């Protein structure tokens, strides 16, 4: 799908402009044109992109996903690759995938190219149609609004991750289950994916805020510097969350190890209690009552009662002895 939006001072916003008019509109420096490609096939998108005068290498990069945020300066326009983290939560676990947003920024136009509908782009598109202030400040300011919407979309995710970590920490102490461990590893994968996006994307915004691009008004660099500050903060939050997840994993392993040690302790105590009983029955056998009765002059019943008293009394004595040694 190809959709377009054009604003010129003193005129209402136009939408769904035929691609044949794009070359004429970009020659008019007073207006601002935004063309958005959503999953458009290469054979249809490439001729339109060539109509803007883009270099074939830049067009190839836009049509082929690279997943590496970058910015290329081509003089009259710049080409950006931005990564977007799409995520969903099922059964308490996050699943994420990386989408790519390719952007061409000229003096009076913005061209965006992506394979599927992106929330950040869609929100900006709707906002531009509702309020001309989103497009009346020029193409570079429109790019700022798109990127700002993209970056701010990470904040709800960070809050959800933080809340889930708190929940996991409480559950770990109550009852460490197998599914909690799976949630911890899912969070580690998600935060690692975020980190792989934030680091190179931060460098892209740093270049937009500091380098001298002809298509970006020096007065608008401060806006990109603001986005850069947001990315720095997001990166710091990501590092803090990674530390919290690692701490939750260490706590889980510590609690499970302690519980395993308690189980082994109980089993060892039970085994120790039965060791003298096993020794007695193994040494004398189960048919020693008659010989012993004749030897000591007791009846078989008396010998049986005596041996039972010994076998019951020994574990009791061992129990109090272990308590005295603070082993229990």
Which residues does each PLM region occupy?
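Hydrophobic alpha-helical transmembrane segments and their immediately adjacent juxtamembrane loops
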Residues: 229-328
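Peripheral, non-transmembrane regulatory/ligand-interaction domains of membrane transport proteins
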Residues: 1-226, 230-235, 240, 295-298, ...
